[in-house]
From Swiss-Prot:
Its EC number is 3.1.1.29. Peptidyl-tRNA hydrolase involved in the recycling of tRNA-Lys from diacetyl-lysyl-tRNA-Lys and is important for mitochondrial function. Keywords: Hydrolase, Mitochondrion, RNA-binding, tRNA-binding. This is Peptidyl-tRNA hydrolase. The record marks D99 as: Stabilizes the basic form of H active site to accept a proton. It comes from the Eukaryota.
Length: 190
């Protein structure tokens, strides 16, 4: 990439610390792992002005990391899109990191901006609030469905995604998902 460009990585999840360590917050967990790869682990998040403390950021010359962790994921679009508007002057590449039921734990998919949101309510909120004017790629971090269940019953799905990650799932995210996410991200921005 040349010229005045910026990578904007946005991790979405539910309010922390209440939902920290849940499958639904795997986007925020992966954001932290990628932050280390980007060499930004020593920097402190700052609240983004005019978001009521619901979005925090770290940035350097070419990268901005946004954490939407102060409100429910399904409502994240309103505050995140206010922040995204600040990057309109750049050739910004937006990537949203989120949990994905339809992808097995340990697997990662980077999907182009024009692809489906697959019924993900956090992505739906971002799409709605941006009015489709901010194209964003989707970095789907697989959490899979509950073992032995193919249910799409909202109560079952909610129980699963709001459940705590097991030690085995955390290990899989660290050893399989994070390297795969890093490879996908570096290919996307090169």
């Amino acid at each position: 990439m040349s010229g005045k460009w910026r990578l904007v990585l946005t991790g979405i999840g539910n309010p922390e610390p209440q939902y920290a360590g849940t499958r639904h917050n795997v986007g925020l967990y992966m954001l932290e792992l990628l932050r280390k790869r980007l060499g930004l682990q020593g920097r402190t998040y700052s609240p983004v002005p005019n978001t009521g403390g619901k979005v925090h950021y770290i940035e350097d010359e070419h990268c901005t990391i946004l954490r939407s962790d102060g409100q429910y994921m399904n409502l994240s679009g309103e505050q995140v899109c206010k922040v995204w508007a600040r990057y309109a002057k750049y050739q910004a590449r937006h990537v949203v990191i989120h949990d994905e039921l339809s992808v097995a734990c340990g697997k990662v998919q980077l999907r182009a901006p024009s692809t489906s949101i697959r019924g993900h309510n956090g992505l739906r909120s971002l799409l709605k609030c941006s009015g489709g004017r901010v194209p964003f790629a989707k970095l789907a971090i697989g959490i899979g469905r509950e073992p032995g269940s193919r249910s799409r019953d909202p109560a079952s799905v909610s129980r699963w995604v709001l459940g705590a990650l097991t030690p085995q799932e955390l290990q899989t995210l660290l050893t399989q998902s994070e390297p795969a996410a890093w490879r996908a991200l570096t290919q996307y921005i090169s």
